[in-house]
């Protein structure tokens, strides 16, 4: 009887720890995705034609700042909620898009997937809110990218 009781407590504790680890990994994975997108955005920016007026070179530079600020905000909220991040936690996930429109489409798809999986607990409302603002910016920059000359590769 006592052995069974302690076994159940340990099982429940393990499940809670697993949930904690899965939640931590969920956020770390998205932060890593953002790191990869920052690298891709910079690569697209550096390879973009530099023309006067409304050009993709300038727009990608602006969008890189939005990506960076969003990543920083999510990472800080993560640490406030789940604890400090390991110093080796960030490892960018590669993005193979070859132009700004394909890139922003990938960002949109994966960000929506992330948003739909954010835990519903009140501890995560800040991350959810920041992600909503980021989705707004994705739509805005998708429109702005479409106005620009986009070099096909």
PLM region spans:
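Charge-dense, intrinsically disordered terminal/linker segments
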Residues: 1-25, 126-129
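Disorder-to-helix initiation segments
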Residues: 12-37, 97-100
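Helix-loop segments that flank and shape redox-cofactor active sites
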Residues: 36-62, 84, 114-126
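Regular, well-ordered alpha-helical segments
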Residues: 43-46, 76, 147
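Conserved alpha-helical segments that form or flank metal/cofactor-binding pockets of metalloenzymes
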Residues: 55-86
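Long amphipathic alpha-helical segments
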Residues: 80-81, 144-153
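Acidic/histidine-rich alpha-helical segments that form the ligand environment
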Residues: 89-145
């Amino acid at each position: 009887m006592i052995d069974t009781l302690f076994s159940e407590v340990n099982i429940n504790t393990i499940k809670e720890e697993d949930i904690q680890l899965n939640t931590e990994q969920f956020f770390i994975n998205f932060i890593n995705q953002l790191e990869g997108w920052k690298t891709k955005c910079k690569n697209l920016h550096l390879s973009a034609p530099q023309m006067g007026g409304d050009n993709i070179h300038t727009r990608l530079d602006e969008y890189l700042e939005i990506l960076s600020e969003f990543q920083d905000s999510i990472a800080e909220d993560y640490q406030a909620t789940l604890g400090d991040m390991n110093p080796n936690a960030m490892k960018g996930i590669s993005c193979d898009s070859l132009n700004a429109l394909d890139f922003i489409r990938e960002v949109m798809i994966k960000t929506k997937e992330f948003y739909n999986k954010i835990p519903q607990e009140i501890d995560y409302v800040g991350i959810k809110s920041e992600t909503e603002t980021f989705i707004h910016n994705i739509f805005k920059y998708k429109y702005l990218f479409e106005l620009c000359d986009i070099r096909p590769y």
